[in-house]
UniProtKB/Swiss-Prot annotation:
Subunit structure: Heterotetramer of two alpha and two beta subunits.
Residues that hold ATP according to the record: 46, 53-55, 99, 102, 107
Designated name of the protein: Succinate--CoA ligase [ADP-forming] subunit beta
Keyword match Methyltransferase: no
Molecular functions per Gene Ontology: ATP binding; magnesium ion binding; succinate-CoA ligase (ADP-forming) activity; succinate-CoA ligase (GDP-forming) activity
Protein keywords: ATP-binding, Ligase, Magnesium, Metal-binding, Nucleotide-binding, Tricarboxylic acid cycle
Pfam families: ATP-grasp_2, Ligase_CoA
GO biological process: succinyl-CoA metabolic process; tricarboxylic acid cycle
Disulfide bonds: none
Gene name per UniProt: sucC
Domain ATP-grasp: residue ranges: 9-244
Function description: Succinyl-CoA synthetase functions in the citric acid cycle (TCA), coupling the hydrolysis of succinyl-CoA to the synthesis of either ATP or GTP and thus represents the only step of substrate-level phosphorylation in the TCA. The beta subunit provides nucleotide specificity of the enzyme and binds the substrate succinate, while the binding sites for coenzyme A and phosphate are found in the alpha subunit.
The keyword DNA repair is annotated on this UniProt entry: no
Assigned protein family: Belongs to the succinate/malate CoA ligase beta subunit family.
Length: 388
């Protein structure tokens, strides 16, 4: 789960990390009031969306007076911001973050991720801040330095100092960086994070470190024990179909194809998408209905899949383990009748009572194409999507 920059900076402040003073604003009036409460004569207004690349897309602006901040608010609030990390529709801008301007001498990068290979939280730093870190890793990997955190000790000051030396920091800056490093390592574990990023971490002209930006991604599997973070979730930034699926305990990810997929089991779902691609088709989604493929869940899954107007056919691929295929077949028939599916539906059943399940589908009178194998199902779905 992503947090907005202003939310991330609230958490940064809880951990005594250096952030500028700012206000989240939902109207032009609030933005105008914000600059009156902030110090300085230059401020920064930022669109709050769950995507990077805001600056290049025009979503970040230096403002010098009330007229400029009002104009920026009127331009963006209620609109959608398109960046290189969004789709063509962009993300809705419902909030601006207005903060004090900063005098910047250097821009650095500081981030942390959970590295599954080493089973450690790994920090990364670079002297190339303020740019896409993926480009730095690809083009100049020697400028990216890493530090793994021992889960027994947490982040240690000496590790922070070592990274500070590699960044070319001097004097009191080293002490400041070590503090930031230790507190971020603590935050990462205590808040159940999946990613933590400051890009850029700046050295001001006064020689101090400042977290100019802040990005937090929370591990969604841990939200049950992070109620305060859960309350920060912004549904407007999520695909509405994905949000609806989550409310029904369905795992759904929207894609850009035209063959809807309904599968039980994440591994089988990925395999189904692969075989659709292998036979020349394009999956419209990833959807795992889980172990209990009941009529109700199948019906909701159909509704979510068919809410995508690009879907021209649906492939249902169910492996009956504990759940019997004959019961699944009855659930599919009931769901198709209830939802009113108007595109071809290809169903492949395998496992417990699969022959009986296929017989029930064949005798149902419902417009369902029964497939005997996964390959057959994929071929049939691709043909159906092409109108053949």
């Amino acid at each position: 789960m992503n947090l907005h920059e202003y939310q991330a900076k609230q958490i940064f402040a809880e951990y005594q990390l250096p952030v500028g003073k700012g206000y989240a604003c939902k109207s032009a009036d609030e933005a105008a009031d914000a600059i009156k409460k902030l110090n300085g004569d230059v401020w920064v207004a930022k669109c709050q969306v769950h995507a990077g690349g805001r600056g290049k897309a025009g979503g970040v602006k230096l403002v010098r007076n009330e007229a400029e901040v009002r104009a920026f608010a009127d331009q963006w609030l209620g609109q959608r911001l398109v960046t290189f990390q969004t789709d063509v529709n962009g993300q809705p801008v419902n909030t601006l973050y207005v903060e004090e301007g900063s005098s910047i001498a250097r821009e650095l990068y500081l981030g942390a991720v959970l590295d599954r290979a080493s089973q450690r939280v790994v920090f990364m730093v670079s002297t190339e801040g303020g740019v896409n870190i993926e480009e730095v890793a690809e083009k100049t990997p020697h400028l990216l330095h890493k530090m793994a955190i021992d889960p027994l000790t947490g982040g240690m000051p000496y590790q922070g100092r070592e990274l500070a030396f590699k960044l070319g920091l001097k004097g009191d800056q080293i002490k400041q960086f070590a503090h930031i490093f230790v507190q971020m390592a603590k935050m990462f574990v205590e808040k159940d994070l999946a990613l933590l990023e400051v890009n850029p971490l700046v050295v001001t002209k006064e020689g101090n470190l400042l977290c100019l930006d802040a990005k937090i991604v929370v591990d969604s599997n841990a939200l049950y024990r992070q109620p305060a973070l859960k309350a920060m979730q912004d549904p407007s930034q999520e695909d509405p179909r994905e949000a609806l699926a989550e409310s029904h305990q369905l795992n759904y990810v929207a894609l850009e194809g035209n063959i809807g997929c309904m599968v039980n089991g994440a591994g089988l779902a990925m395999g189904t998408m692969d075989i659709i691609k292998l036979h020349g088709g394009q999956p419209a989604n990833f959807l795992d209905v889980g172990g209990g493929a009941t009529k109700e869940r199948v019906a909701e899954a159909f509704k979510i899949i068919l809410s995508d107007s690009a879907v021209k056919a649906v492939l249902v691929n169910i492996f009956g383990g504990i759940v019997r295929c004959d019961l699944i077949a009855e659930g599919i028939i009931a769901a198709v009748n209830e939802v009113g599916v108007n595109v071809p539906v290809v169903v492949r059943l395998e496992g417990n009572n699969a022959p009986l399940g296929r017989e029930i589908l064949a005798n149902s009178g419902v417009n369902i194409i029964a497939a005997n194998t996964l390959t057959d199902a994929a071929i049939q779905a691709v043909k159906a999507a092409e109108g053949k």
